[in-house]
Amino acid sequence: MICPHQGTCGGCALALPYEEQWKLKESEFRELLPLSKDTPTDLYPSAPHSFRARAEFRLYRNESGRLSYAMSQKGSKQPLPIQSCPILLPSIQALMPSLLEALESDEILTQKLFGVEFLSGLSQEVLVSLLYHKRLDHAWEERALGLLSSLPTLSSLIGRSKGQKIVLGESFITETLTIDSKPWRFLHYEGSFTQPNPKVNEKMIEWIISAPPQGDLLELYCGAGNFTLPLSSRYAKILATEVSKTSIHAAKQNCELNSVRHISFVRLNAQETQSALEGEREFYRLRELDLPSYDFQAVFVDPPRAGLGAEVASFLRRFDQILYISCNPKTLQSDLEVLQLSHDVERFALFDQFPYTPHLESGVILRQRR
């Protein structure tokens, strides 16, 4: 990747040629989890540029008043003015200069504007959020509508200030992911978590659904259904739980968007789900579900960086098959210490969702020992 700011921009921590950093990540993973050296491991590197679907920039004016995007300098909070960012999807890269030019010529839109956020996808829709240290009034909204209409590739525009959000267009983009040649549509909401690297995300989903299905599926940490929807093509019944109200709302919308009827999304955290399935607590949110009718033999988890923790990991040992996507190899290592008391690892996978950073996504398929 050719970037004039590589090595000085704080956004990319690994200033190495892509092939070198990918080999480094694989090596570090295998050292941390020696079992992976003797276990089938599938490798999914990223494209070296034009891969990232989200971006957050500060706004910076130099001494002559010229406006530019900015990142923090490496190892510092000092702003580093930039005009482009080659890791971003082409849809974002193409919009950045024209958006900046339009903003620079409008005093109302730039007054107390401190940040710009981009959200896009393979569908090429682009949603932009403008972040302010001021109350947004009718004059701002009129100028923002003019900005939106003047930029054909800008799908929606959101203005944000403390306690205030003005949506011009939609508060989401509609993304299409192609999984094993089948298109799946998703609403990706501004401000909510979405996978940052859509092409690698497609590979992650394909890898997970390639595992032979068993019985019915329980999913914890389901988010907006990124994995759940494609998994529905493999399982007769799925119960998917998630603590975020916004994500559950989006997941149900995504079900409707794809005409899927055999997933039940419920707002519960992992510990609450465990309590419900073990009969320790009854939840009003589960009142319409016939839990005893489920034949849970498989469980899928995609936990946050903190991992599962010993309690949830112990609970998963009751399932014959465990499908695990991890965004933190260190917590995966500690979770596997618990899971391997009863299960064998059948396969690993490494996914580079975050090139030019130390972060690495991985997958594990485990099966209960007989």
UniProtKB/Swiss-Prot annotation:
Q: What is its EC number?
A: 2.1.1.-, 2.1.1.35
**Positions annotated as active site in the UniProt record:** C327, E361
- One GO molecular-function entry: tRNA (uracil(54)-C5)-methyltransferase activity, S-adenosyl methionine-dependent
Cell membrane in keyword set? no
Q: Keywords in alphabetical order, please.
A: Methyltransferase, S-adenosyl-L-methionine, Transferase, tRNA processing
Gene Ontology terms describing biological process: methylation; RNA modification; tRNA processing
InterPro entries for the chain: MeTrfase_TrmA_AS, MeTrfase_TrmA_CS, SAM-dependent_MTases_sf, TrmA_MeTrfase, U5_MeTrfase_fam
Q: Which reaction does it catalyse?
A: uridine(54) in tRNA + S-adenosyl-L-methionine = 5-methyluridine(54) in tRNA + S-adenosyl-L-homocysteine + H(+); uridine(341) in tmRNA + S-adenosyl-L-methionine = 5-methyluridine(341) in tmRNA + S-adenosyl-L-homocysteine + H(+)
Residues binding S-adenosyl-L-methionine are Q195, Y221, N226, E242, D302
Gene Ontology cellular-component terms listed? cytosol
Gene3D superfamilies, per database record: 2.40.50.1070, Vaccinia Virus protein VP39
Please give the superkingdom of this protein's source.
Bacteria
Q: Which Pfam families match?
A: tRNA_U5-meth_tr
In the record, the note on similarity to other proteins reads: Belongs to the class I-like SAM-binding methyltransferase superfamily. RNA M5U methyltransferase family. TrmA subfamily.
Instruction: Describe the task this protein carries out.
Output: Dual-specificity methyltransferase that catalyzes the formation of 5-methyluridine at position 54 (m5U54) in all tRNAs, and that of position 341 (m5U341) in tmRNA (transfer-mRNA).
- Which protein is depicted? tRNA/tmRNA (uracil-C(5))-methyltransferase
Species: Wolinella succinogenes (strain ATCC 29543 / DSM 1740 / CCUG 13145 / JCM 31913 / LMG 7466 / NCTC 11488 / FDC 602W) (Vibrio succinogenes)
Q: What is the lineage of its organism?
A: Bacteria, Pseudomonadati, Campylobacterota, Epsilonproteobacteria, Campylobacterales
